Amino acid sequence: MQWGRRLVWIGTAITLLFSLPIVGYLLGYGLECNYEECDPKDVPKGDVALDLGGSWRRAWYAAELVKARRARWLITSGVGVDLVDAKLIRDLGVKEPTLILDVEARNTEENIKNARRVFGEWCLPDGQPLAASRLPRVLVVTTAVHMPRSMLLMRKYWPEAQAIPAPTEFMVKRKDSKGICWDSFVPSLCALECNLAFYNEYLGYMAYRWLKR
């Protein structure tokens, strides 16, 4: 009975801790600290924009990279590829053959493996494989908090590519962020949801870094 009460108290304390915005600020900053918000036209030039799909904001940013001539092709991927995102990209003026849809990937690892395979199949006008002519420069488009894990997976599953982070959807380092203030210490359900997402990113990063060698 005493152990049961202790477990309840421990669970309550952990839940309360993860409900604090200040905890999310620290966790999120640890993931986003190496990246900055950047206008699409200021992103270094690459060959391919790899949109690790999942939201219209990422789809929009990836399309803007192509329109700004930062990339020649756009590969958008995700679980079944959100048709709304694909339609948005087309509506923004990026269409096939510049746009390539990956409808098979179920996670980030498969996103990258499939994109590598697709790039390896492309040929120059003279028939020479594009991948044989130079190392690919890949603009990796995903949320800022997901970028550390995405870059790790790029090094692991597409090692010959020069991966260039093109982060979007910042959650902590937003230009309009209030930073730490009094309500950073007030628990909320929104903070709990964000903090669990941050925690999941750390777990995913560690799993690929140390367990999946």
Locate each region found by the language model.
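Cytosolic-side transmembrane helix boundary signature
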Residues: M1-I10
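A structural signal for short, hydrophobic/glycine-enriched beta-strand patches
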Residues: T12-A191, N195
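Structured C-terminal subdomain patch of bacterial secreted/periplasmic proteins
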Residues: C190-R213
